[in-house]
Amino acid sequence: MKFSSGKSIIFATIASLALSAPVTYDTNSTAELQSPSSQEILGWSHATFPTIYQTCNETNARMLNAAFKDTAEITAYGKDRLLNYGVDDVYYKRWFGNGSIFTVMGVFEQLMEASKGAMLMRCDDIDGLCAANPNYYAGHHRQSAPAETVICDYFYTSKKPLSTICFEGTIVDVGPKHYAGIDMLHRYLHVPTMSMDGYVGEYAETLEEVVDYTQNNATYAVRNTDNYLYYLADVYSASVIPGGCLGNL
């Protein structure tokens, strides 16, 4: 079969485009094997992520990278909400009261763009705490190595991707740390370089205490880890279902 020179050019161009076009996937199972730092992170100019230690296998790494990407996505939603609605926003008032929006914005920036060069996520039960708490510990911060976090096997079976938010109960029912990306942010804040040596910390963990901080101690509402976690889950859920799926406080 013969082709005219014009048709030959067209076919050559199509072939060239086909060879140069990036491969895309309908699922994230292959993409998540890549480090999030090698991919575009919407909402952040210089997002950073911890190092995954060699004791984590391919499946561990895929799920941890997926959680890292969820941290970037949900904090971007939170930051965008702050910028667009400010301190008068119902979501802001619900979790930070009259606390400083500059503090909240700064914490989001710290979580996503501060250097994490020394932070390490490891998958070996080096301290034996995962085995000692098999259905409770999803991970733990290492006091003897402050930049290190151990991720237990329970993390992979108990923590869910953001894509499932609002489909397994309300946020009040399951808690924000039910979601891997939000749980990962709380693990970041156990690391002194991330928490600014405890400026942000787990000063109150129960929902009742978190709400009390909002209403009566806004200075600490903007310093309390769980206020951030509930805020992020609440705001993100509103992008899934109008009004979100917080549940009854």
UniProtKB/Swiss-Prot annotation:
The keyword Signal applies. The keyword Membrane does not apply. Glycans are attached at N28, N57, N98, N217. Transmembrane segments: none annotated. GO terms for molecular function: integrin binding; metallopeptidase activity; zinc ion binding. GO terms for cellular component: cell periphery; cell surface; extracellular region; fungal-type cell wall; fungal-type vacuole. Residues 1-20 form the signal peptide. Keywords: Glycoprotein, Signal. Belongs to the ZPS1 family. This is Protein ZPS1. It comes from Saccharomyces cerevisiae (strain ATCC 204508 / S288c) (Baker's yeast). The gene is ZPS1.
